Amino acid sequence: YETADRPEPPVNPAAYGAAGALCGPPRALQAFAAAAMAGKLIGPPMRAEMRKGDPALAHAGLGVWSYEAPLDGCVGPTALVERRGAIGAVEVRLVMAPAIERSLVLFSNRADVPLGEVWAGEGLTHALASAAFCKI
């Protein structure tokens, strides 16, 4: 939704190419995350290179953001790998915790509901990541 009472017009994410960044049904993204964490997509050396999040570049790695975040309920910071996509008011977040082989797929079509930043310890994504990765 662009606003609480006005829906976003229909879009075809494929028409946006790389601008869409991430699209697909939730189960497909969950399957992708499981395969990525299990090493079925790329080998250990390339996976390690991809996950080298550079703090000088907002923790950007190769096609992902990779960082440690303070999550509620976890002992110490948790290593996370994140991929995002957005077109208009539609947002997608894929957050992976490789050390425990768990992931979170989040879709939102509400511009009035801020997803926040996990690394900053704020917002809906942080709350859901804390529940998914720490309160198990």
PLM region spans:
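Catalytic loop of the DD-peptidase/beta-lactamase superfamily, centered on the K-T-G motif
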Residues: 3-136
